[in-house]
Curated annotation (Swiss-Prot):
Molecular function GO terms recorded: ATP binding; ATP hydrolysis activity; ATP-dependent peptidase activity; membrane protein dislocase activity; metalloendopeptidase activity; metallopeptidase activity; zinc ion binding
Residues the record marks as active site: E576
Modified residues (N6-succinyllysine): K118
UniProt subunit comment: Homohexamer. Forms heterohexamers with SPG7. The m-AAA protease is either composed of homohexamers of AFG3L2 or heterohexamers of AFG3L2 and SPG7. Interacts with MAIP1. Interacts with DNAJC19. Interacts with PHB2.
Name of the molecule in the record: Mitochondrial inner membrane m-AAA protease component AFG3L2
Function in brief: Catalytic component of the m-AAA protease, a protease that plays a key role in proteostasis of inner mitochondrial membrane proteins, and which is essential for axonal and neuron development. AFG3L2 possesses both ATPase and protease activities: the ATPase activity is required to unfold substrates, threading them into the internal proteolytic cavity for hydrolysis into small peptide fragments. The m-AAA protease carries out protein quality control in the inner membrane of the mitochondria by mediating degradation of mistranslated or misfolded polypeptides.
Subcellular localization(s) per the UniProt record: Mitochondrion inner membrane
InterPro entries found in the cross-reference section: AAA+_ATPase, AAA_lid_3, ATP-dep_Zn_Metalloprotease, ATPase_AAA_core, ATPase_AAA_CS, FtsH, P-loop_NTPase, Pept_M41_FtsH_extracell
Name of the encoding gene: AFG3L2
Taxonomic source organism: Bos taurus (Bovine)
Residues passing through the membrane, by range: 144-164, 252-272
Alphabetized Gene3D superfamilies for the sequence: 1.10.8.60, 3.40.1690.20, P-loop containing nucleotide triphosphate hydrolases, Peptidase M41
Length: 805
């Protein structure tokens, strides 16, 4: 274009208005100017011819420039790509500064087609395809919705085309010969796929309905012979004969026939991925059948809201766990003294005492990766999955070290070996062997603390429990009265209490009313109280609601609508009165709180006592308890001269107590100072640890002990028969009696008893639990910069409510 303008300018046709003549050296004009313009014109003409001849060269150069740009996602394979080394850098011209390029705005992780991330790269777990591979249909993803919509439109249009397309009208060979060929309306015949013939009509002679017609043929040879014969019969000769064209068409019906197969394969793939090995995966690997050997453990980082301030009643266990975290955060504190960091600890104790809750609190405050897995997740239907998952679990732990690994319900995989050689037992033993090797073998795991929880430590393999694997065994038993008070304080925080109630006093009172309760029972009591208050549309929770909740947890649901015959109700009243009076006049019996003849749970009556916080029992104390338990059966016999089935539970308790005294506690002179383990309920007993003669002696002594207790109870209630009758009659009238009613009927109890929180904790040094921390654990979940801690710094203990910094 520049050359053309220069040519026109040289010819004088393109001189702009007002433009002065071209200045020449020396400022000369005239003839010299004309000569200069002729030379310039000659040069421009030569350049224009050259440019016209090199048009193909320019196109090729432009194509090469286009191809020099690497495809998107393959930049690193090209030397001048943005990820590769640049072979030639544009040199900076002297005196010319490069302007800094504006920084590219960061792409959102989920934006753009492709789901975020480069093509060919590994998609993150939030990508819709990764979620779809795990069996999760990502309806909330816009890209997935777009693909789904286009796929649905494609298949919908495909089906619409095949369902509603014009299929023509089928005719027979006879109709074709008589109605079409004989009338001369056929232009040509199209043999489609050698299966049928489509009739094409002569222009202007199309049938009224506008549909084409077709007819089936058996074979091409037969069709050609019949057509030849028919045209000869009709006298169609030479050029008038109908031409036959052979064509092959694909109507797409094969796609429709493949649709059921595709759907079945898709369903099978989805089922495999959502099968036993694919459910509950954590996003590591493909999932499904090809990753059954991968661990299903979860790595928790800042995902748990439970803190140590939410765990109470097990302060000693909390200190142990804090120390394990301190091992990981500040190992130099122990290594300077030559100490080795313990490998792990196992939390044991009855159900509901807070083992898993303590592990959750550790995950919430440890400030190190916390890996959790259940013992049952190691065992699957495939052989060899258990050991493979153990290896993968510890590989994951080493990758995240320092970290804490928690195996919940480890008894599922850690049972004692050598109990039969069944298939499942062999797989469990292989898994246990791999676990033993990973915990303390040649490939020793460093900076990984292993915690485990179980309520069946007696069935665990001894090799698993030895030091070097689980160095510490932390027993978490039912909380004492101080522990229950602390637990009640935790669970009373979110509750809307009556304004007249003080949380401190209420927690202590409830702790004194719930002896033997675990932490889970205490939480259940608080929740039941809130439910009872909501049931009655109360604005807040009062003390009566808590008392009803305790009765609900101990005795079961109150059945006020259950109909009892008058005779049955009278029997129940005298039965419960026998219990109450026997316990009232026996020194070592538990104090009575309430007695009721309203049916609860499985029982027709209910008596609530207040057991002492006691760990050692004498023979006399156990005998008084047996007599109190037999008071109901004795009362029935004294007042009615007959016995009923209502004492079944009482007799079971008495029998268990008698066997425990003789077999376990060595409290019988004839059997001697021996102790045998009593079988647990549900255990299969193949042989007894004592002879038949000893078994017979034990049975005889148990029977004698129970008979002595029964005779003693008969003598007591016969003496106090009038008191039993008073209590029974008042029960029939009021249905529920408390301690004050008993005092009015029988007078004060002749023995001293404790009933308040202060009386129970008297002599223990303090009213509350000791939650102070040792000096070395003040900053248990923080890394120390120096080796020495400033002695004057005061750090609030996490036990008292402070979270991590």
């Amino acid at each position: 274009m520049a050359h053309r303008c220069l040519l026109l300018w040289g010819r004088g046709a393109c001189r702009p208005r007002g433009m002065p003549p071209m200045l020449l050296p020396g400022g000369r004009t005239g003839s010299t100017e004309r000569l200069y313009l002729r030379m310039l014109y000659r040069y421009a003409t030569t350049q224009a011819k050259t440019s016209r001849n090199s048009l193909l060269t320019d196109v090729i150069a432009a194509y090469q420039r286009l191809c020099s740009r690497p495809p998107k996602g393959f930049e690193k394979y090209f030397p001048n790509g943005k990820n590769g080394k640049k072979t030639s850098e544009p040199k900076e011209v002297m005196g010319e500064k490069k302007e800094p390029k504006p920084a590219a705005a960061p792409r959102p992780s989920g934006g753009g087609v492709g789901g975020g991330g480069k093509r060919g790269g590994k998609k993150d777990d939030s990508h819709w395809w990764s979620r779809f591979q795990k069996g999760d249909i990502p309806w909330d993803d816009k890209e997935f919705k777009m693909y789904f919509l286009w796929t649905a439109l494609f298949w919908g249009g495909f089906l619409f085309y095949f369902l509603f397309k014009s299929s023509g009208r089928e005719i027979t060979w006879k109709d074709f010969a008589n109605n079409y060929l004989s009338k001369g309306v056929v232009d040509r015949l199209e043999v489609v796929n050698k299966r049928f013939v489509r009739v094409t009509f002569t222009p202007g002679k199309t049938p009224v309905d506008g549909q084409y017609v077709w007819f089936n043929i058996g074979s091409v040879d037969t069709f050609e012979r019949n057509l030849e014969t028919l045209q000869q019969e009709l006298g169609i000769e030479g050029e008038n004969r109908v031409p036959v064209v052979y064509i092959a068409e694909s109507d797409g019906s094969f796609l429709l026939s493949m649709l059921p197969t595709v759907l079945i394969i898709a369903f099978l793939l989805y089922t495999i991925r959502r099968g036993p090995a694919g459910i509950g995966r954590t996003g590591r690997g493909m999932g499904g059948l090809f990753s059954v050997g991968e661990t299903t453990a979860k790595v928790l980082k800042d995902e748990i809201d439970v803190k140590f301030k939410d765990v109470a009643g097990c302060e000693e266990a909390k200190l142990e766990i804090m120390e394990f975290v301190n091992f990981l955060k500040n190992p130099k504190q122990y290594q300077d003294l030559g100490a080795k960091i313990p490998k792990g600890a196992i939390l044991t104790g009855p159900p509901g005492t807070g083992k898993t809750l303590l592990a959750k609190a550790t995950a919430g405050e440890a400030n190190v990766p916390f890996i959790t897995v259940s013992g049952s997740e190691f065992l699957e239907m495939f052989v060899g999955v258990g050991p493979a998952r153990v290896r993968d679990l510890f590989a994951l732990a080493r990758k995240n070290a320092p970290c804490i690994l928690f195996i919940d319900e480890i008894d599922a995989v850690g049972r004692k070996r050598g109990r039969g050689n069944f298939g499942g037992q062999s797989e469990q033993e292989n898994t246990l062997n791999q676990l033993l090797v990973e915990m303390d073998g040649f490939n020793t795991t460093t900076n990984v603390v292993i915690l485990a929880g179980t309520n069946r430590p007696d069935i665990l393999d001894p090799a698993l429990m030895r030091p070097g694997r689980f160095d510490r065994q932390i027993f978490i038993g039912p909380p004492d009265i101080k522990g229950r008070a602390s637990i009640f304080k935790v669970h009373l925080r979110p509750l809307k209490l009556d304004s007249t109630l003080e949380k401190e006093k209420l927690a202590r009172k409830l702790a004194s009313l719930t002896p033997g309760f675990s932490g889970a029972d205490v939480a259940n009591v608080c929740n039941e109280a809130a439910l009872i208050a909501a049931r009655h549309l109360s604005d807040s929770i009062n003390q009566k609601h808590f008392e009803q909740a305790i009765e609900r947890v101990i005795g079961g649901l109150e059945k006020k609508t259950q109909v009892l015959q008058p005779e049955e109700k009278k029997t129940v009243a005298y039965h419960e009165a026998g219990h109450a009076v026997a316990g009232w006049y026996l020194e070592h019996a538990d104090p009575l709180l309430k007695v009721s003849i309203i049916p609860r749970g499985k029982g027709l009556g209910y008596a609530q006592y207040l057991p002492r916080e006691q760990y050692l029992y004498t023979r006399e104390q156990l005998l008084d308890r047996m007599c109190m338990t037999l008071g109901g059966r004795v009362s029935e016999e004294i007042f009615f001269g007959r016995i009923t089935t209502g004492a079944q539970d009482d007799l079971r308790k008495v029998t268990q107590s008698a066997y425990a005294q003789i077999v376990q506690f060595g409290m019988n002179e004839k059997v001697g100072q021996i102790s045998f383990d009593l079988p647990r309920q549900g255990d299969m007993v193949l042989e007894k640890p004592y002879s038949e003669a000893t078994a017979r002696l034990i049975d005889d002594e148990v029977r004698i002990l129970i008979n002595d207790a029964y005779k003693r109870t008969v003598a007591l209630l016969t003496e106090k028969k009038a008191d039993v009758e008073k209590v029974a009659l008042l029960l029939l009238e009021k249905e529920v009696l408390d301690k004050n009613d008993m005092v009015e009927l029988l007078g004060p109890r002749p023995f001293a008893e404790k009933s308040t929180y202060e009386e129970f904790v008297e002599g223990t040094g303090s009213l509350d639990e000791d939650t102070s921390l040792p000096e070395g654990l003040k900053d248990w979940n923080r890394e120390r910069e120096g080796s020495e801690e400033p002695s004057g710094e005061k750090v609030t203990s996490p036990v008292q409510g402070a979270g991590p910094a």
